[in-house]
Amino acid sequence: FLSSADVPKPKDVLGHEIGEDYFLASYEEAIKYLKVLDESTDRMVLLNMGKSTLGKDMLYAVVSSEDNIKKIERYKEIARRLSLCEVSPEEAKKLAREGKAIVYIDGGLHATECAPAQHNIELVYQLVSSEDPEISSIRENVITLVVFPNPDGMTMVSDWYRRNLGTPYEVSPLPWLYHKYVGHDNNRDSFMANTVEIQNLSKLIHHEWFPQILVNHHQTAPFPARIWIPPNSEPTNPNVHPLIVRWQNLIGSRMGAEFDKEGKDGAISRVHFDTWYPGYVTQVVDSHNIISILTETALYRYATPHFYTLRDFPEEYRDLTISAFYPSPWKGGWWRLRDAVEYVLTASRAVLKTARDHKEELLLNIYKMGRDVIERFKKEPPYGWIVPEEQRDYPTAILMLQRLNLLGVKIYRANEPFVSDGIKYPAGTFIIPTSQPYGLYVKNILEVQKYPDLRKYPSLWQGIVEPKKFEGAPLRSYDVTGWTLSYNMGVKAIPANTPLKVNMSPVKEVSLKPGKVSGTGSFYILNHSVNNSFKAMNRILSKGGEVLWTKKEIQLNGKKYPEGTILVPVSSVKRNLIEDMAKELSLNIETTKEKVNGNSTIKIKKARIGIYQSWMANIDEGWTRWVLEQFEFPYESIHDSDIRAGSLNDRFDIIIIPSQEPRSIIEGHKLGTMPPEFVGGIGEIGVLNLKDFVEKGGKLLAIGDSCDFAIDILKLPVVNVLKDVKPDDFYCSGSILRVECDTSNPIAYGMERESSSFFEYSPAFTVIPSYGKEGSAKSVVKYPEDSILMSGYIHGEKMLFNKSALVEAECGKGKAILYGLSVIHRGQTHQTFKLFFNSLYLY
C-alpha cells in the first residue's frame, strides 16, 4: 500500500517494526503510537470506553474518511435506529443509503495470542496513511473501530516475554492469569458480563455504535493450518437469523480468496470452532443480528520464530492433500510473528472490503433481521419471559435483568395486573418480550438448551458423498452445552406460551428497590436465601458484630422461619449500619423482641481464608477470587512455598483448593521449563502439611478436579465414581442438572431442597460407611434417581443417579468439603453460591 509521507510509521515511534522477531509492543506502547497518529491525521479519533480491571484507560481507534469523522454522531444514530428497528421500511432504505457500514475489529482478548493485538497497531496505520484506492474507498464507506479488549493482559505478556528474552525460559508460559481474575475465560463471559472489560465492550457495541459486523481475532489455528476462518463447524446455535450464517460464510469465503490471491497458504474452515455457546465475544452478538467473524491464526510462542517441517505435522496432513475447506495446504517452513500479523491484516482487510462493497445491504440487513424477529414472535411462542418481583432472591433477579439490559435487551414492567397462561401476575411484574429486535438473544439465554447429539446427524458435519453414522463416544462440544440463565442464577422466569396481553411500560434503568429495617427488638432477622445477606454478614462480622444461624425451623413474631435463618443481636451492631446495608443491598430486615434459645442457634465467626494459587495459572482459582471479592469475603492467596513451609493452622482456618488436576498441584511446572521460582508444586512435604492442617482442625474446601486430590491425601471414605470412566459410558461437558439438598446441614442453609446445579466434567461421589479414626463422611447435595438433565446434554446419566455432588467429610479434628458440582462456574451460578459461602465461616 502507498503511504502518506507525513504520517509517522510505528517504527518511528516504537523503534521496532510491528511483528519484528523478539519484539512485542505493550498496550502502553500501542497507545503511545496511536496518540501520535491521532495528532497527525483527521482520519481517526482515539476514544475511551472505560477502565480495565487494573485501571488502564481502554482506548480504541475510530478510522474513516475526514468527512465521515466529522459526521460520526450522525452515522452512529443511523446505525442505532436501523439496529433497533425504530423506522419504517421506507425510512430504513433512505438511512441505509446515507449511512456507513460500521465494523468492529478487536485483537488481543487472549493476550498470549499476540499477533492480533500487534496487528491492531499496523491496521490503524495502514487505514489512516494509505492512498491506495482500495483503502481510500474503505475509508469512504466504512467506519472501522479497532479495539484492544484486554489491555492488562497485553502488557502482562509483553513484560513477561521481555523478562525472559534470551534466556532458557524465553517461550515459557505465564505463571499467572493474563487477566487478573479470569484469564482465557474472558472469552466465555460475554452474556454474563462479569468482567469490566466485557461490560465496557457491551456498552460500546449494544448502546453506542451498533456495528453490522464484529471481528474477533485469535491465534490458535488447528495445526498445521496457518489461519482458521469461517464457515464454522457444527453444531450451529438455532437462535440466529439465517442471514447471519450466510454472511459469515460469504465473508469467510472472501477471506479465503484474499489469502490465496496473496499467496498465503494454509487457510482452513469448518473444523474445530462451533457457534453453540453464546459466551464468546463473537456468538453473543449473532443473536443481536450482528455478523460475527472469528479468526484463529497460527501461533508458535510470543515473538520467537520457529521452523516447521512435514515431520512436525499430524500424519493426515503430511501428504498435503487438499480439501474443499483447506484447498491450499501450508507446506511448512519458518513461522514468525510478522507472518501471523500479515495473515490477520489480510483477514481484516477482507472484511473491510466486503463491508465497503455491500455497505447499503449490510445496513438494510440488520434492519430486516430485527424486523423479522419482531414479527416472528408476534405470531409464535415463546412470546417472552415473565419475571415476578416476588423472588427467593430478589437482588439476584434484578442482577439478571440488569445484565440482559446491558446486552441491549428491552425490559418492561406491567402497569396493572394481568394473566398469562392462566397465571395471575400483579402490577410491577417484569416482562421481557421476544418481539423485539434482540428477541432471539432473549430466547437464546433464557430457554432450555437441547444440545444435538451429533452422532445422529452425520450430514451436518461430514462433508462426504455418503455420510456415515458414528458409533463411538459422543462427539465433544467445544464448550458447555447448557446455560439457561434463570436456572443458573436461581431466578423465577416463566416463558409466555400465549400472546402477552398486558399494559406495560419500558424500564429505562433496572435498579434495586431500597430495602428497609422494620420495627425494634433484640434481634435483626435476615433471609439466608438472599445472596446479598452474605455481604451483610461479612460487614457485620468485620465491625465486631455477632451473627447466629438457627439450627431448625423457628417461630418468631407469629411467623415460621426456616432453618438457617440469620439472627443478629441488636446490641452487637449499630442500627445505622444495618439500615444502610438494608437500603444498599435491598434487604428487608425484620426485628423480633422474642428471646431465642442459645441451643437452637449456631454462632458463626469470621474465618482466616487462604486460596491456593498455583503457578499453573488456574482459571478456576481466578474466578474463586472474583466471587469472594464480590461478596466481601476477606482472603489471602497462598502459593506452593507457603504450603511447603507448613504451620498452616497458625495462618488459616480454611484453605480452598480450586479445581486443578491433582498431579499438577503436587508437581507444578517441570524443572527447566520456567524460571526457578515458579518450578514445582507443593511437593510431598506440602501434601503432608495440608493433611496436618486438616487433622489439627482446619477446613479444606476442594472444588472439581481437586476433589480427587483431597480424597487421596486425606484418605477420605469417599469414591469418585467418574474418575476413570470413559466418554463411551459417561459424558457431560457443561450442563445444568437437578440436585437435592440436605437443608438441615449448615452448608445448605438458604437452599431449596430441590435445586439446579452446574456440571462440567465434574466428579460425583459415593460415601463409604466409615467407623475408623479417619472419621465419617455425609452427602450434603446429591443427584436424584431420575430426570437429572435440566438444560444441555448428558450421556450416561444413570451413572449419576443417587450419587453425591457435595460431600462433607471429617478428618481428625478438621474436615474436608468436596464440591463435585461447579459451584461458582464462571461467576454465573448464583443459585449455588450459598453452598460455597456457607462453608467460609467458622461454626
Residue ranges and their predicted role:
Residues F1-C114, Q118-V142, V182, R188-D189, ...:
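Intrinsic-disorder/low-complexity accessory segments
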Residues V124-L127, E131, R139-R163:
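Carboxylate/His-rich catalytic cores and anion/metal-binding grooves
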Residues V146-N150, Y161, N216-P224, S706-C707:
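Short, solvent-exposed turn/loop segments enriched in Gly/Ser/Thr/Pro and often Arg
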Residues D152-G153, A221-F223, R301, R663:
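Feature marks short, surface-exposed loop/turn motifs that line or immediately flank catalytic pockets
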Residues M154-H179, G183, Q199, K203, ...:
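Active-site-proximal cap/loop segments of hydrolase catalytic domains
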